[in-house]
Amino acid sequence: MIRLHLHLLSDSTGETLENIAKAGLAQFEGVETIKHFWPMVRSQGHLDRILLEIAQRPGLVIFTLVNNDIRTRLESRCHALGLPSVSALDPVIDALSQLLGQQALARPGRQHILDAAYYARVEAIQYTIAHDDGIASEDWEEADIVLTGVSRSSKTPTSIYLANRGYKVANVPLVVESPPPPSFYSLVHPLIVGLTTSPERLVQIRRNRLLSLNQSPETAYVDHERVAAELSFARRIFSDHGWPVIDVTRRSIEETAAAIINLVNERSAKEEAK
C-alpha cells in the first residue's frame, strides 16, 4: 500500500479541486491517500503558513490559484522542497483562452459564480427528495423534469443523480389500480420522460427487492404476466401523451441521466429557435 499526502490549495472553497482529485485517484489502486484541504488561500501570509505544513507532510500539491504572485510563490517553494505541483485548471483555461481569443479573468473563486449554481443544486436536491414517488403533486409544475414509469423502473436513483446535476426532478409511479391525479397530464413546464424496461429485468429487480426485505418473492408483484401487463399499460400512457421514452434495461443510471439531459437540451434548443 502506497501512502500519499495530497495537498489541495484553492483561493475558493476547494470543491473543484476535490472533484478533480477524486476522479484522478479513482484510476489507481493500492494507494492510501491523506488529503489536506487548504481553501480560501488569498494572501502570501496564509500561503506561508500552509507551506510550513506541506514541508512537514510532503506529497503532491494540486492548486487552483489565479493570483500570479501567490501561485508563483507556491510553485517556487514546491520546487525548492522537491515537490510536484500542478495547476488543475491551467490546461482548460489555456485552451479556452486560445479558442476565444481572450485573457482569463484572474478573479479568485470565479468558478463559484458557481456559487449560484451550487445553491441551485442544493435546492434541486431538496426539491427532488421532497417529490419522490408521487409526493406533493401540487408542486410538480415547478419541476424541470418529471420521470414516470412502473415500480422499480429506476425512477428514484435517476432522479437523485439528475438533482446532483442541478435539475429539479419529481417522479411519479404508474400503478394500474391507482392512477396519478389529473393534473399530472396537464403539466406544462417540466419535461416528462417515461422509463421502461424488459419484463424479465423488472421481475429480477423486484424479486431481489422482496428478498432484501425478507418478504416472499412469490407474489403478483413479480408475476411475469402481471409485470408485462404493467409495462404495456405504462407504454400506452407514454404513447397517448407523446412523452419521450427511455428503455433502462441495459443502461446504467448515469447513461439514463445523460439521455434525459440530452432530451432537456434538445427541448430548450427547439424553444429558443421559435
Swiss-Prot record:
Binding residues for ADP: G149, V150, S151, R152, S153, S154, K155, T156
EC number: 2.7.11.32, 2.7.4.27
Family stated for the protein in its record: Belongs to the pyruvate, phosphate/water dikinase regulatory protein family. PDRP subfamily.
NCBIfam families: PRK05339.1 (NF003742)
UniProt cross-references to PANTHER family, sorted A to Z: PYRUVATE, PHOSPHATE DIKINASE REGULATORY PROTEIN 1, CHLOROPLASTIC
Function: Bifunctional serine/threonine kinase and phosphorylase involved in the regulation of the pyruvate, phosphate dikinase (PPDK) by catalyzing its phosphorylation/dephosphorylation.
Protein name: Putative pyruvate, phosphate dikinase regulatory protein
Organism: Rhizorhabdus wittichii (strain DSM 6014 / CCUG 31198 / JCM 15750 / NBRC 105917 / EY 4224 / RW1) (Sphingomonas wittichii)
